[in-house]
Swiss-Prot record:
Entry's family note: Belongs to the glutamate-gated ion channel (TC 1.A.10.1) family. NR3A/GRIN3A subfamily.
Protein name: Glutamate receptor ionotropic, NMDA 3A
Record field: intramembrane: 716-727
Signal peptide: 1-23
Binding site residues for glycine: S631, S633, R638, S801, D845
Lineage of the species this protein comes from: Eukaryota, Metazoa, Chordata, Craniata, Vertebrata
Cytoplasmic side: 695-715, 728-741, 949-1115
TM ranges: 675-694, 742-761, 933-948
Amino acid sequence: MRRLSLWWLLSRVCLLLPPPCALVLAGVPSSSSHPQPCQILKRIGHAVRVGAVHLQPWTTAPRAASRAPDDSRAGAQRDEPEPGTRRSPAPSPGARWLGSTLHGRGPPGSRKPGEGARAEALWPRDALLFAVDNLNRVEGLLPYNLSLEVVMAIEAGLGDLPLLPFSSPSSPWSSDPFSFLQSVCHTVVVQGVSALLAFPQSQGEMMELDLVSLVLHIPVISIVRHEFPRESQNPLHLQLSLENSLSSDADVTVSILTMNNWYNFSLLLCQEDWNITDFLLLTQNNSKFHLGSIINITANLPSTQDLLSFLQIQLESIKNSTPTVVMFGCDMESIRRIFEITTQFGVMPPELRWVLGDSQNVEELRTEGLPLGLIAHGKTTQSVFEHYVQDAMELVARAVATATMIQPELALIPSTMNCMEVETTNLTSGQYLSRFLANTTFRGLSGSIRVKGSTIVSSENNFFIWNLQHDPMGKPMWTRLGSWQGGKIVMDYGIWPEQAQRHKTHFQHPSKLHLRVVTLIEHPFVFTREVDDEGLCPAGQLCLDPMTNDSSTLDSLFSSLHSSNDTVPIKFKKCCYGYCIDLLEKIAEDMNFDFDLYIVGDGKYGAWKNGHWTGLVGDLLRGTAHMAVTSFSINTARSQVIDFTSPFFSTSLGILVRTRDTAAPIGAFMWPLHWTMWLGIFVALHITAVFLTLYEWKSPFGLTPKGRNRSKVFSFSSALNICYALLFGRTVAIKPPKCWTGRFLMNLWAIFCMFCLSTYTANLAAVMVGEKIYEELSGIHDPKLHHPSQGFRFGTVRESSAEDYVRQSFPEMHEYMRRYNVPATPDGVEYLKNDPEKLDAFIMDKALLDYEVSIDADCKLLTVGKPFAIEGYGIGLPPNSPLTANISELISQYKSHGFMDMLHDKWYRVVPCGKRSFAVTETLQMGIKHFSGLFVLLCIGFGLSILTTIGEHIVYRLLLPRIKNKSKLQYWLHTSQRLHRAINTSFIEEKQQHFKTKRVEKRSNVGPRQLTVWNTSNLSHDNRRKYIFSDEEGQNQLGIRIHQDIPLPPRRRELPALRTTNGKADSLNVSRNSVMQELSELEKQIQVIRQELQLAVSRKTELEEYQRTSRTCES
């Protein structure tokens, strides 16, 4: 109300200040554009207005000890406000309606006799405001984004209303009809209302409303406590009664009697003046019914002794002729008292059947002291005052919406806005709208709303029918048998009293139920196997798989199964076992009931499809099954139509993928070490080789020309050879370094290579076997699922809770995955394991997926990602089933006593594939595909070797001649001894030829006594060269030392002095070493000359032989 006042004040200010308000309103976001008719919408202000009159609060009168048929029912009480004060409503912000309990008709005597009840006030104004607020939140109720407004009349003593600031509260209502008409015109009709809602409380006010509707041609809906009799049938004036129609109770009671073929009945009245006219008329119109006695115990109720004596006589007289007794006008206290007295003193004939004819409140129903087989009917929830007000307002809104689609101008623009100019010739908007009011039906808050005849708005409630029976524990319990909808009874699964004889095979004992249980195959909760040759199950429960959900077919199959002549085809028989079957057997044992088990015909859990529920849910709703036991997920949609027990198994949704054993690719042998490690190893190798070379050439003891006058040289290529040999473990001849630093560094490199090689070898086997790759999904929010690309395929089971979750949470994802959904979980697993696979990922309950992973012999399945959509498995039951509470209690006991843990260990104790110990042969048995990379590497090596050979020839023929011509590039000994020889080959050959031609001359010039010694004073490399053996005339190559003949110095020349460790010269040692070295060189020369002499002698012999042979031939 305060919010409406603020908006009215803002509108008035905007009228005074047009320019600023225009700027303010320009910033308000505009609503969506209206297609048509824009001019009409602008004229009516984008609102449909409904007037309201007779808004005085209703005060319910206290009930008398003896009720008339139109008395109101006692419900939840409210304190009546003090005179002159207003009740302050406190609605919940998210509530759809405000609950003010209506006093409807109920069993009399719910209070003590003579005790009054406090009066209660009902406030029509508040109910109207909340009805408008709730209906404006309903999308699509009115077309063109129209809103609903209420225009309330101003009544004396109620104060001014913000919706009508221009009206004066001082205008009192007159008692005569003409003054009332004038007041309605001046305060309500001028606002352009489409209809009027009224709350009359007397016959005179009803006549005033008749006058208003006839004169102004405006539809009026009167909300009354009970129907007022009317002589005229005015189609513009409708009345909606808050009282439950007596005819509804009569119809339900007659339907119950007809359903059970109880045509012979008697009546028992607790109140003499109770109205049973409608019931008697219905039974008299049907020739099958026969009314016996009418037992009126009104006068005998106060005295127990009188009541006992009277009932004993009456009940004995009717037990044979009319065994059915219908009770009217009795509250629960009186009913209990009657049955307690008759049972205590043994005057209750056991063959009597009892029916309560009055509607009962389910919350007031008790079982103590009541006989088994008692039938009652009533509503689970009681309608309240605000429900009827909102339904009346919605009736107007729906009629306007329908009329607008045909003639918008006539439906939206009221014809009567000035009472002085009433349209009488043409069709008015009120007359046009009344046609649609009479043909509008919908399901409202108070019941099914429709117009009966031409003046009555009927709110038909759906009644439930209960029967007092034994529960599985042997205790009395109210069991729902069915419901009364649309004038007929819709049966539930409960057993009607007269139908017990038709279910002899199902009920062998009155206290032991025989239920029909439906299941669905889902491992490990339900397995199936074939029956034996005799059609029996050595282990597990016998179940039928008839491939249908037709109740009559199942009845005939089970009847045949339990008969002596079993004609059920063997193909329909299966043996069911598993987690849920064990649980079902335990529940049946503890609750003492038998059951027949069958597999759901369509193989679905259940979903709303083509206007009905399928699968397990559909079988429960149609009464085909009394219980559904399998991995039945509890979700919101299913819980709204069926009952679930408390969860016996908690799970969530998961994602299943397939792992693929990939053969090691070409570069797999390098996978044990990261590429950064490989790079580091080869960089360290070459750095080590560089430092080895530097240390060796800088050391005085190194294997270099300057070191110890060695015949071999340690170059950079030698260092690389050592480093690679140590890294890869080659056993080849190498030239190790001679200096201490080089050897230390070489050993350090060997340690480094040992650790690298051991790490590589340790990881090589696992890598070469092949890596298991799979689709990496983080969960349901993974981009691969929300934005699938490159043919990524994923799905779930059709009509399962997983599909329902995806459809509600991610509609776009559901639309994509529909093409990949599968009929059942085994199909999805098979699609993953196929080669090639038909699915890349499968979404389903994680409990089912974990089991599939654990039994996968090939270890190809894996669950990935975070679990999502936590849910539980429960046992499904029909709505309002009496078994729900008992089974839930048993499940709680099973959990606390460890039975559920035992079931889990029994059916889930399978070694997970990831924890299996593989055989050694399975791991190390590798084929050529695992080493394909090494073979490729070897082939690449062959190719590179060919390229290297070609490169050598190119270097030898093109590059070396150019290097030889450059004097600065002649020395390559530090890099490669072989390269150095190749570059200096021409120089050595010239020296060798020069030595061969002149050595005889040199030796002939030496005197006989002259000692020829070599000049050893110069220790440089130029005077120490190797002899290169030539390949002349096919002889073997021998290396000799070539040096330049230098004239010997005087024998007394002082040798250069060398410093020893003590600082003195040691010339004796130097000369001694030089002589020994020269002697060894001379011995080598003698050996060479000797070989040449041998060759010369051999040649001479050959020539002489040749000469002798030639002479012989000439002669």
